[in-house]
Regions:
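Catalytic alpha/large subunits of respiratory electron-transfer oxidoreductases
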Residues: 1-11, 46, 154-157
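Conserved beta-strand termini and adjacent loop/short-helix elements that scaffold enzyme active sites
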Residues: 11, 94-95, 161, 185
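Short, solvent-exposed amphipathic alpha-helical segments in soluble enzyme
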Residues: 1-5, 62-67, 88-91, 172-178
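A diffuse structural propensity rather than consistent per-protein peaks
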Residues: 12, 116, 137-140
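Short, exposed beta-strand "edge-strand" segments with a Pro/Gly-rich flavor and a Y/T-containing core
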Residues: 5, 88-95, 132-139
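Structural detector of well-ordered beta-strand residues that form the stable sheet scaffold
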Residues: 7-9, 49, 73, 159, ...
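Active-site diphosphate/adenylate-binding microenvironment
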Residues: 1, 121-185
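Glycine-rich, acidic loop regions that bind phosphate or pyrophosphate groups
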Residues: 14-119
């Protein structure tokens, strides 16, 4: 990812994989995602999916609209999850993602992708989840999560339960240190 300067998105279970300020991190996808992450998926010409079953929470209910113009490559150990009648997969590689990444780690892809990378980062900067213009007389979950993100220490762990707090935290928690972790039920 870093070697090839590839824009990346994550699912809600991958929230803590990238630091918020990582140059290649665009956002989160799905109904618990953000605009930038979803725009990146919907405008991609190639989606490389690593270890995800592409569930409804990631793709939405209209499977044929997910990555509608993209070639979709899935690398996953569980082939049965991808034999369901859901998202169109153009190429499936049935292997462990860790093994796959070890094999391709030093491969360099052809350039240029600068325009695409800039477009993705523009979406990320233009449409953050936390807008900062909430009524200060009431508690707002997005404002709370943003403040919590700013106050978390380097080795902090955040756990959210189900319901609205899960949606808001999964969507708006900012990971600012590599050792921060996020778990949900």
């Amino acid at each position: 990812i870093g070697t090839n300067n590839l824009p990346c998105v994550v699912t809600y279970l991958g929230v803590d994989y990238f630091k918020q300020d990582d140059i290649n991190y665009v956002g989160r996808i799905g109904i618990k995602g953000d605009r930038a992450g979803n725009f990146a998926i919907q405008n991609s010409d190639l989606i490389i999916c690593l270890g995800s079953r592409l569930s409804i929470t990631q793709t939405g209910f209209e499977y044929d609209l997910f990555g509608r113009e993209a070639t979709i490559l899935v690398i996953d150990i569980d082939k049965d999850e991808h034999q369901k009648n859901t998202v169109r997969i153009d190429e499936f590689i049935n292997t462990d993602v860790g093994f796959f990444l070890q094999k391709i780690i030093n491969k360099v892809l052809p350039k240029p992708r600068d325009l695409w990378h800039s477009k993705c980062l523009n979406w990320k900067n233009k449409w953050p989840v936390y807008q900062g213009d909430y009524d200060s007389n009431n508690v707002n979950m997005y404002e709370f999560t943003n403040t919590l993100s700013e106050l978390l220490g380097e080795n902090s762990t955040v756990v959210s339960d189900a319901g609205s707090n899960f949606y808001v935290v999964a969507q708006s928690l900012l990971i600012n240190h590599f050792n921060q972790r996020y778990f949900t039920s």
